[in-house]
């Protein structure tokens, strides 16, 4: 009968491991503690790219958080304005180099009405151009001996006419196109007829209105060119601009009236 092999305690060839002895157990080399003065063969490398990426991500997160906070404050401001006054506040975005008004035809005007709105916008820019050039022409006439009073009157026309035309007829048309409001369309037609009448009078420039030479109409141009050729040329250019603005305004009025009748 075979017996299981029992270790011989008196056998010197076998190594006895006493678990209770100090340091008696075999410890793998990888898990042994590093003694004082012992050098490490392996070094830990931390790539700089990862550090740069993490800093960039932190900056992006900070920028994103700031932008979200700004939008949240803007939305809160609008909600407070609507709740208090019932009026929606639009961000100023035009002109791009110095925003003073909100203007976004592509996003706020229906697609089928955008062409008409662009035509009306061209008409408004046209009257601004006419009034600004009118100031330049009267300044040339003043330099050539025409008197300073006509220059000051032309400056007043420009300072009042440019914002007034926007408030009285262009902005109401813009809102009428957005909301399809018959009341706003009616106000636009009334004020736009006054605008057309002013353009026609300015193109003629009778001496009984606006102190004669303060507008670059045809009668004023004929009178000025006899005294100064250069000033007369400027006046005739201004006369042509007022004529083009009058024709464009009549065309815009016809187009918008047909659009209004077609929608109603």
Curated annotation (Swiss-Prot):
Keywords per UniProt: Cell membrane, Coiled coil, Cytoplasmic vesicle, Membrane, Transmembrane, Transmembrane helix, Transport
Organism of provenance: Arabidopsis thaliana
Region (Disordered): 1-33
GO annotation, cellular component aspect: Golgi apparatus; mitochondrion; nucleus; plasma membrane; transport vesicle membrane
Cytoplasmic-facing ranges: 1-122, 254-264
Membrane topology label: Multi-pass membrane protein
Subcellular location: Cell membrane; Cytoplasmic vesicle, Secretory vesicle membrane
One Pfam family matching this protein: SCAMP
BP GO annotations: protein transport
Gene from which this protein is expressed: SCAMP4
Coiled coil: 51-85
Transmembrane regions listed in the UniProt entry: 123-143, 150-170, 185-205, 233-253
Primary localisation category: membrane
InterPro entries listed in its UniProt record: SCAMP
Purpose of the protein: Probably involved in membrane trafficking.
The keyword Transport is assigned to this record: yes
Family: Belongs to the SCAMP family.
Top-level taxon of origin: Eukaryota
Protein name from the UniProt record: Secretory carrier-associated membrane protein 4
Keyword Transmembrane (UniProt): yes
């Amino acid at each position: 009968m075979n017996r299981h092999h029992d270790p011989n305690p008196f056998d010197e060839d076998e190594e006895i491991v006493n678990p209770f002895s100090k340091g008696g157990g075999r410890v793998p080399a990888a898990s042994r503690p590093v003694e004082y003065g012992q050098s490490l063969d392996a070094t830990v490398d931390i790539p700089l790219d990862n550090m740069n990426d993490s800093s960039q991500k932190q900056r992006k997160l900070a920028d994103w958080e700031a932008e979200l906070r700004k939008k949240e404050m803007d939305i809160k401001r609008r909600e407070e304005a609507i709740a208090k006054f019932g009026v929606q506040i639009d961000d100023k975005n035009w002109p791009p180099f110095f925003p003073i008004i909100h203007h976004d035809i592509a996003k706020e005007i229906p697609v089928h009405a955008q062409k008409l709105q662009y035509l009306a916008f061209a008409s408004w820019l046209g009257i601004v151009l006419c009034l600004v050039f009118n100031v330049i022409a009267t300044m040339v006439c003043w330099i050539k001996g025409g008197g300073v009073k006509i220059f000051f009157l032309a400056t007043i026309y420009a300072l009042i006419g440019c914002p007034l035309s926007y408030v009285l007829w262009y902005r109401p048309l813009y809102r009428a196109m957005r909301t399809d409001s018959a009341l706003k369309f009616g106000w636009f037609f009334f004020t736009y007829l006054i605008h057309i009448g002013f353009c026609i009078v300015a193109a003629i420039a009778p001496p009984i209105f606006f102190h004669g030479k303060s507008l670059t109409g045809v009668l004023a141009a004929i009178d000025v060119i006899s005294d100064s050729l250069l000033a007369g040329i400027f006046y005739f250019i201004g006369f042509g601009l007022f004529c083009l603005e009058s024709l464009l305004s009549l065309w815009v009025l016809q187009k918008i009236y047909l659009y209004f009748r077609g929608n109603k």
